[in-house]
Amino acid sequence: MAESVVGEFLEFLKKNKRLSKNTLESYSRDVEQFLTYMNEHGINFCSAKKSTIVNYLYFLKQQGKSQATISRALSSIKAFYHYLFAKKKIEEDPSYGINAPKVEKKEPVTLTVEQVDMLLSFDFGKDEKGLRDKALIELMYASGLKVSEVISLKIEDVNLASGYIVVRSGKERVIPIGSYAVAALQEYIEKGRKPRKGEKALFLNLRGKRLTRQGCWKIIKEYADKISPGLPLTPNILRKSFAQHMLQNGADLKTVQEMLGYEVNFGNNLLSLVSRSKMKEVYNKFHPRA
């Protein structure tokens, strides 16, 4: 019964809340882990009490989970029981009144310009994998793209002659890329990306299919471990490093936000206040690898 109820809950979220696939997966994972915990303690999910949830949160803390992870788990559990209560599957919501632990705000981790240079000076090799990986990492630092945006790029979205890429996932935008990224992409497209019939994705795995989110993370971690074990490197850290280095070098916040895809809201109009030529000018002046 629990599995079918969780399925109904996730379907409700999908239809009514319009959550991303990753967010839905987080809800599913959090709720299923809580149900497993209750099952191991002989507790039916319909009979859970406030103390059951509080004890579970304490259990997560004892497991060394971060406050952010515990807060997210509680948020998922609350959503699950709000749903059950609204659908009259339970008479009382046991999650009501439980507050999440305060999450400590940490300074965002970024790489130094020297660390980025060390990373991108690595000998990636000239085979299919090496050319792809070099182009991927160069582009991520050059553009500040999210993983989902990088893997969604198509060949037709890249204009190497003009030094621009078109990002179509999320808020569509045209952003400049520097000479290092252009050179790496050109070499990858010409020598490393083998034509695959019907496959338009820019970045492919070694089987000729579109690179996945997990594949992208794996590539980044591989080179972090090779270059400097313990180096804090994830796709999001590359994105944050792009923004921080631009701002440190004097770029204005508004232009950097436009490049990152943030919407600037003025009254009832959502305006792109930075022209393409202005963005290119700022990029060439302030990006370390323009």
UniProtKB/Swiss-Prot annotation:
**Nucleotide-binding: is it a keyword of this entry?**
no
Q: List the GO cellular component terms.
A: cytoplasm
Keyword Cell division belongs to the record: yes
Subcellular location, record wording: Cytoplasm
Catalytic residues (positions):
R239, Y283
Where is each Tyr recombinase domain found? 106-290
List the signal peptide residues: none
In this chain the Core-binding (CB) domain maps to 1-85
State any single GO MF term.
Answer: DNA binding
GO BP terms? cell division; chromosome segregation; DNA recombination
Keywords assigned: Cell cycle, Cell division, Chromosome partition, Cytoplasm, DNA integration, DNA recombination, DNA-binding
Question: One Pfam family this chain carries?
Answer: Phage_integrase
Family of this protein: Belongs to the 'phage' integrase family.
What does this chain do? Site-specific tyrosine recombinase, which acts by catalyzing the cutting and rejoining of the recombining DNA molecules.
Q: What else is known?
A: Although strongly related to the XerC and XerD proteins, it lacks the Tyr active site, as well as the Arg-His-Arg-His (R-H-R-H) sandwich residues that are clustered with it. It however contains the Thr-Arg-Gln tripeptide, which is characteristic of the XerD subfamily.
What is this protein identified as? Putative tyrosine recombinase TTE1313
Q: Look up and give the organism this protein is from.
A: Caldanaerobacter subterraneus subsp. tengcongensis (strain DSM 15242 / JCM 11007 / NBRC 100824 / MB4)
